Amino acid sequence: MQSEATRVASLPCIAVTAGDPAGVGPEVVRAALSSPDLARGFRFELVGEQEVSFKSGVPTARGSGWAFAALEAAVAGALSGKYAAVVTGPVNKERMKEVGFGFPGQTEFFASRCGVKDYVMCLTGGPLCVGLVTAHIALSEVPSLLTVREIEKTGLLLAAFLERRLGRLPRVAVAGLNPHAGRAACLVQRRPLSLVPPSSD
């Protein structure tokens, strides 16, 4: 008969990084890992040096170096097969740049380390999964980057991901740049922004 320790050891392991040690990440991670609602079909491993002390609310380059090292360890473990997935806490992007983190965000970091060129940041809650056409850029830059090609690429990547996850083709909708402005965009600009639906190309 299989022992409980053996059964637990055989479960897929998910790596968890706390993010910036001076931020909200460590507190949220501790609460999540002790929650009775935590998925029981997995093991969770907190990645990163544990015997460290940082002042809450005061992000530093040292703390970001700690967070960066945890990310590197987590992605290395995932690529080696040690971890089935990685969950990350939030980092301080300004301080991360000071320690050589040359990415706009963690999404781009993982894409680079995994050698992935085409990827989409997804936000999932309940039955809804949202794929972002743009991310980690200034809002003023969004209109110039919202092209038919980028919308189509994001939609196809999102659909492929959801098909693997759900086992069926999903329904994909495209939200406007400013959905609150109405169909004619009359609230915010004199000239409507035209986006040709990818399906018509």
Where in this protein do the model-derived segments appear?
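Contiguous, glycine/small-aliphatic-enriched amphipathic segments in soluble metabolic enzymes
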Residues: 1-107, 145-201
